């Protein structure tokens, strides 16, 4: 029960932050884990969650999703319980939790986020809500009974799937019929009466509301905006790369997905649950229970396996309907039909699954500590028609952690700039064996990777020497499938692009015999004479 008690105290502080001095602790996931570990030592092995719930339910919260959270997450208080005292925590810990209490985006800065060991930035609030939903071990909550009567229940019969979900079959052409039939309303369906608690609390509600707002203002939602920390060793300030970003930043999506994945894990394992500090240390480290795939580096791949697009669309719709019924005064949701909410849910899910889950995670230049570009970059004329594959050769060993990959990036940039006298690192992108891509010159600047052809294609390099061995499967899948499909969708790469190895155009052994022989079996590979 320690996991419950510690998390309820943290959630209480999240929902009821008190003003005070800024924490001296760096905004690192390790600091959050440290905070949970300290709380776990203070919480007795009792039904502490019931005690804390009374306190949390009485808290004042300015969040627009307060009613959704209370309906799906918080239990009714017991009159026989006493409130936990947050002041028993150290002042430094109180200050840290208050600092990450609410996720927000203001004036180009993002609040309530921390830097994880894998180099990703994570919003704390949706992560902790997902953990709590998982600890409760109930995935489905009923709509409130008073909202099943007039005026909450409109009584509108949704004639068929196409009427309920305009464009859904076109939006998800690869969804199997059984999946669609299992998750979408049938021809007699009415107002949804259940909602997935994990996804509604961590992701679906925010996803739907953000796209609803942007559809009303005719503005794209700016899904997954990245940002830069003021420093990486002891980060304090996170500035977004797009000052017009929506709340669905990369950090928020990371936190929401982590919360859903870990909450799902907690709901399926037997009790007693492991200490949450231990679970987070594994997830943001080598992997939960030693599984190297079940960790934050591969959240997108694991998230894609957690739910299908039609299922997520259904859950986004149900979250919006529930919020509409719980908050009839909500301006965004007034005079909006369920069919319109279904359209928003379809659009939001399509964008999330294709532009986030379906795309590789790319660390921006600031994340690996890039030196400034020397001179003035030449813009590419997009879309390009070629993808050129390299291996770095030196560094020879694959990089398997953010720290080692970032160090390799800085080393290659120094060599390219100081020894070869290039303006910048030559590659467009570099592929680590840690589950991440690293931005070099990126999508818009001409690189220095394939002499004579730099303006015609993107240069992508695997870290390592692949003369006699291959990169890991995750890295290969990224370059073969995720990266080009995402670039095509964004209009950066032509659908009929050609894939070539470096050696086909320049006198070199790059990208190594083993890797090149594999490339020859890939789609879009083209034989040319050097």
Swiss-Prot record:
Domain N-acetylmuramoyl-L-alanine amidase, first and last residues per copy: 386-512
Signal peptide span: 1-22
Positions marked as site (Important for catalytic activity): 427
Keywords linked to the UniProt accession: Disulfide bond, Glycoprotein, Hydrolase, Immunity, Membrane, Metal-binding, Phosphoprotein, Secreted, Signal, Zinc
Annotated family: Belongs to the N-acetylmuramoyl-L-alanine amidase 2 family.
Function according to Swiss-Prot or TrEMBL: May play a scavenger role by digesting biologically active peptidoglycan (PGN) into biologically inactive fragments. Has no direct bacteriolytic activity.
UniProt name for this protein: N-acetylmuramoyl-L-alanine amidase
